[in-house]
């Protein structure tokens, strides 16, 4: 039916991405280390203790430059290395107050002056700060991405969708038919919950942080702004690149 092509996590919400070869999945939980931290802005009082909507955070829909951040996380030492094409690399311990201050100073040039400014780097306590109020993992279909790129007439990067899992070997939009059903990736079962409604973040190039593609306009030609699906793991296990995908 298809296979697991790529695994990605985003340790700081909207601030970088990291590719993985394998990952341990726990039933009912978000992807380990995904959206484990988030950056609140000065109009929010969120502290990470409970899940709150994305409007509380600095994010790519308001600050497209954030989309070009890459991140590597050494969890053993709790050290993150962030890079951006317009900024020097930054190495921080995300739980260290002094490093949190350095991080906020580092990303300040990426936040437009007419937007709420970043205020705090907070750890998500109850669950990863995904865009759903339930623990979710985002699953994308490369065939659907190619359909959008073809509609645009542009060779756009799939990284602008900020998925956790990329699947290949499927038909375009096949993932939409999975909503309300279970799929297996390797030996792990997931409940596909709903489609993901997309925002302006996807219009920004993940290499440059510049808006350069009308992804939302392309989706609207199909009568919606939805791309990828949210799923919740029903069982635990290890996923690896190349694992098969099938409906159950």
Language-model segments: residues:
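Metal-cofactor-dependent catalytic cores
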Residues: 1-248
């Amino acid at each position: 039916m298809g296979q697991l092509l790529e695994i990605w996590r985003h340790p700081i919400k909207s601030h970088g991405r990291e590719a993985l070869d394998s990952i341990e999945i726990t039933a009912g939980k978000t992807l380990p280390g995904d959206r484990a931290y988030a950056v609140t802005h000065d109009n929010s009082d969120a502290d990470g203790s409970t899940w709150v909507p994305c409007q509380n955070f600095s994010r790519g829909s308001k600050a497209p430059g954030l989309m070009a951040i890459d991140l590597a996380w050494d969890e053993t030492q709790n050290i993150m290395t962030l890079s951006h094409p317009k900024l020097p690399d930054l190495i921080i311990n995300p739980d260290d107050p002094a490093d949190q201050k350095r991080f906020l100073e580092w990303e300040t040039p990426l936040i437009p002056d007419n937007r709420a400014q970043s205020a705090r780097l907070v750890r998500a306590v109850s669950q990863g700060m995904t865009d759903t109020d339930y623990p979710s993992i985002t699953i994308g279909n490369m065939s659907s991405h190619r359909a959008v790129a073809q509609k645009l007439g542009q060779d756009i990067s799939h990284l602008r969708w900020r998925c956790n899992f990329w699947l290949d070997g499927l038909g375009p939009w096949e993932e939409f038919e999975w909503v309300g059903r279970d799929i297996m990736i390797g030996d792990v079962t997931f409940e596909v919950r709903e489609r993901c409604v997309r925002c302006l973040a996807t219009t920004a190039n993940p290499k440059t942080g510049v808006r350069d593609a009308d992804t939302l306009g392309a989706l609207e030609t199909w009568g919606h702004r939805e791309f990828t699906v949210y799923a919740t793991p029903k069982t635990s296990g290890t996923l690896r690149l190349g694992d098969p995908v099938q409906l159950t």
